Amino acid sequence: DGTIDMIATDHAPHTVEEKSRGLKDSAMGVVGLETAFAALNTHLVRKGVITLERLVELMSINPRRVFRIEGGIEVGNRADIVLLDVEHQWRVDSTKFLSMGKISMFDGREMVGDVAMTIHRGNVVYDNNTKQY
C-alpha cells in the first residue's frame, strides 16, 4: 500500500571492544550488511508477508530511484548487480563475518537466502563461494 518505500541497512561495523562499553558509552549501530537480505527473506518472503519481487524492489529498485542512481540491466551497461541464492540455508556465525563488526543480533539463528555474488561496474567484488571481495 506504499507504507514502506524502501529498506536499507545501517551497516555500522564496530569492534567487539567498541560495543562492550555499556549502553551509554558503546558505539551505536549494528552490522547489517551480511544478514539484511537473509533476515528479510527468511522472515518476510518465506512467511508470505511480501513477495521476493517486492523485497528486491524495496532493497534495490526503489533506493536507486529515490537517490537518482542511474543504471539498470541494459545491453551495453556495465553490470551493477547482486546475485542471490534464495534457497541457501545457513546459520549466522558473526565470527565469520568479513566485516570488522563481529556482533549480530542474529547470531546462531537459521536463515534462508544469501548473497551469492556482487558485481560492480562489470567486476566481481564479492563471491560467496570463495569469501573474497
PLM feature spans:
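C-terminal cap of metal-dependent C-N hydrolases
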Residues: 25, 78-133
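Acidic, glycine-rich loop-and-beta core segments that form the ion-binding/anion-interacting portion
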Residues: 1
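His/Asp/Glu-enriched, well-ordered alpha-helical/loop segment
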Residues: 5-7, 12-87
